[in-house]
Amino acid sequence: MVALLAEHTDTRQQAGLLVRPDNHDALSVAVTATPVVTTTGTPATPPALELDVQQGDGIGKRAGLPSRKQIETWVTSALYADAALTVRFVDEEEGRALNRSYRGKDYATNVLTFAYAESEDDPVTGDIVLCCPVVETEAREQRKPLEAHYAHLIVHGVLHAQGYEHEDDAEAEEMEAIETETLQALGFEDPYRDDHTPVAH
């Protein structure tokens, strides 16, 4: 297999030509486009982000909610393509109702991600819903700063919105490695250092 890289008309992408044997007397050729990344694996040019931050009933009164600037920083750190995302903070009642309706689980979970892109060619669009009481309880039980736990779950949700999953061990290891690298680059500790944070998808 031979892979050649070249400049792309979009400065955030690099064009590629992939040539590999198909049969004994044939070759398959594919043209690709991938984000230009730095040595740390993050895009060299930050993707464009359309961000909507929402709060459910009574959420504005809760202490420890991240600011819009923090949310935007955390979301962007985990993006590999332009995206339109909503980050919504909800109470236990709304979180439970969403989890019951869409996953068939009658309890509130820490984070839910609703990804709307139907193929890899579609723009990254999705909703990331965080249940504040659950996040606060987990941070306290795991002895983590609340800010760090919110950052972790938002990064986790952003990865889900881009198609990452943790259905098997290999997928889980990949996601955890990306999350750890991203959070450490943001100045947080490894979220999996002592505990495996339970996350929903």
Curated annotation (Swiss-Prot):
Q: Where does Zn(2+) bind?
A: H156, H160, H166
Q: Does the keyword Ribonucleoprotein apply?
A: no
Q: Which Pfam families does this one have?
A: YbeY (PF02130)
Keywords of the record: Cytoplasm, Endonuclease, Hydrolase, Metal-binding, Nuclease, Ribosome biogenesis, rRNA processing, Zinc
Name what cofactor the protein needs: Zn(2+)
The record's comment on cofactor binding reads:
Binds 1 zinc ion.
EC number(s) reported in the record: 3.1.-.-
What GO molecular functions are on record for this protein? metalloendopeptidase activity; RNA endonuclease activity; zinc ion binding
Q: Localized where?
A: Cytoplasm
Q: What is its main location?
A: cytoplasm
Q: Where is the signal peptide?
A: none
The superkingdom listed in its UniProt entry is: Bacteria
The entry assigns this protein to a family as follows: Belongs to the endoribonuclease YbeY family.
Q: Describe its function.
A: Single strand-specific metallo-endoribonuclease involved in late-stage 70S ribosome quality control and in maturation of the 3' terminus of the 16S rRNA.
Q: What is this protein called?
A: Endoribonuclease YbeY
